Amino acid sequence: MACKSAGTRIRSDYMDYKSIRRTLHMGESTERPQDRAEREYRARIEGWSTFRSGVTLRGHEVFVVNFRELAALLDTIREQDTVVTSLWNSLPREVKHAYLNDLIGTEMLSTNGIEGVRSTRKEISDALQAARTNDSGKRFSEFAKLFLTLGDDDDKVPDIPGTLEDIRRIYDQVTAGELKDDDMPDGDLFRKGPVFIDDTATGRRIHTGIEPESEIKVALTQWLALAKDKSIPPLIRAAMCHFAFEYIHPFYDGNGRT
């Protein structure tokens, strides 16, 4: 069993879209809350603008409603991506590498901080250098190597995990030498015991990961199919994959890094 703490949550109430939970508090219906929630869920997941993930978590499929503000935001991101790509391609290779090193270093520090792993700028810098020279002896070098693969400016696209074993392999890479003994996966590939996430400010339990391991494997098999589903726009697919993976929480520790 493991218990994790949650950091600050991103607010999403600046948009007109209302969550199902919020919708329940807005009406004065005498219908049972569970029945109203289920009816609202069915209406949304079967809507014309809904992208369905195929990932079922505790009896309900993960979905995204492509509402007006989200569609506009995605268009803005695509436009900005074109501008950024043009500017990026105009930079000398040395400048690109220097910028990527700084960007990846900052991201690794942030990710480690969220995961509760202590790291310094010097350690991250050494890890990036080791990753570029295939020196696996440095702390975080395997983690850095994965980030560098994502940032390479060649045309090679990093392979998306295709099997449950691939997920475990990536996990082993990014957590190498950083896990406590009682945080090591104790199942076939993933954890076999429960894991909890608590709010650090209130101590309130806000999430329990999927269990047992057999159910984790079922959910992650669906997740692998979602990751390769080209019928869903890439940004929406990435958001659904991120949510579903963290919800499943297949490991006691290191889920965010994976």
Feature-to-residue mapping (PLM):
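FIC/Doc superfamily catalytic core
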Residues: 1-258
